[in-house]
């Protein structure tokens, strides 16, 4: 067994099990540096085990479908139902069988600083990705619920021509009128890795669009609020009025439209 603290730290880096004999051997070493390194490595392993357990639980729907013979399971989710401006964006993602991506979760639970990293990991591992975008004008015409369905259907359509085609759909709290076997899962983005993958793809795609709109329409803080009705956004509306990407069927934009048409 190594004796210097530096050598012990290097040995601990290779340990992946809490039952490794090295932990028991080092438990009697009274040096504070050794005990600190020991506890630090145990904490890392515990976190990795917890993450593995979480990811395994989020594969429960997929594993049940694999047992039934399905091979290409697509997760579908959307982002952007609630904002006052911008499109609703849906994504359809097919991951390889039993694929696990560390940190993948409901996009709302992923720290913003990690969005891009996990998004890139999904893009690298996914067998197929489709994205559907429905703009604010169509949202106003058909309502946000129907627009969400259209975005999801468009995301599925975008898979046409790709090597892998879905034989089953796992959808976040929605049922689609399409001839593919499917299951609607409440809070699916937190309970299915396939849906979570779609969630982060849709989220990053929409955030990039809103950051671009922020450059086109400064003063509304779109890059930070993604079109949601924050204090800065509402101040922008009051100061500069409605932009071409605002949803005129959403309040307070709707009332502002009415006010502008009344003398």
Swiss-Prot record:
Pfam families reported in the protein's UniProt record: RNase_HII
This protein's record includes keyword Protein biosynthesis: no
Domain RNase H type-2: 71-262
Broadest EC class assigned to this enzyme: hydrolase
Binding-site positions, a divalent metal cation: 77-78, 172
Cellular localization per UniProt: Cytoplasm
The reaction(s) this protein catalyses: Endonucleolytic cleavage to 5'-phosphomonoester
Cofactor: Mn(2+); Mg(2+)
Cofactor binding note of this UniProt entry: Manganese or magnesium. Binds 1 divalent metal ion per monomer in the absence of substrate. May bind a second metal ion after substrate binding.
NCBIfam families in UniProt: PRK00015.1-1 (NF000594), PRK00015.1-3 (NF000595)
Function, in words: Endonuclease that specifically degrades the RNA of RNA-DNA hybrids.
Protein's name according to its UniProt entry: Ribonuclease HII
Organism, as annotated: Streptococcus pyogenes serotype M1
């Amino acid at each position: 067994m190594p004796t210097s603290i530096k050598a012990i730290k290097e040995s601990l880096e290779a340990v992946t099990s809490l039952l490794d004999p090295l932990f028991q051997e080092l438990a009697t070493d009274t040096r504070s540096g050794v005990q600190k390194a020991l506890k630090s490595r145990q904490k890392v392993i515990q976190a990795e085990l917890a993450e593995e357990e979480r990811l395994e639980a989020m594969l429960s729907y997929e594993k049940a479908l694999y047992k039934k013979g399905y091979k290409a399971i697509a997760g579908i989710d959307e982002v952007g139902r609630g904002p006052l401006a911008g499109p609703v964006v849906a994504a359809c993602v097919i991951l390889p069988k039993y694929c696990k991506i560390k940190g993948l979760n409901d996009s709302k639970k992923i720290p913003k600083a990690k969005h891009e990293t996990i998004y890139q990991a999904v893009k690298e591992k996914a067998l197929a990705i489709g994205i559907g975008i429905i703009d604010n004008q169509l949202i106003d015409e058909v309502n946000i619920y129907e627009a969400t369905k259209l975005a999801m259907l468009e995301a599925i359509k975008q898979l046409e021509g790709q090597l892998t085609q879905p034989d089953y759909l796992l959808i976040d709290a929605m049922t689609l009128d399409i001839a593919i076997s499917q299951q609607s899962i409440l809070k699916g983005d937190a309970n299915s890795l396939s849906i979570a993958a779609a969630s982060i793809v849709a989220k990053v795609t929409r955030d990039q669009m809103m950051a671009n709109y922020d450059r086109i329409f400064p003063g509304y803080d779109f890059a930070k609020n993604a079109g949601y009705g924050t204090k800065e956004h509402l101040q922008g509306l009051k100061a500069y009025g409605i932009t071409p990407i605002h949803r005129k069927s959403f309040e307070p934009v709707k009332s502002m439209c009415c006010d502008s048409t009344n003398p």
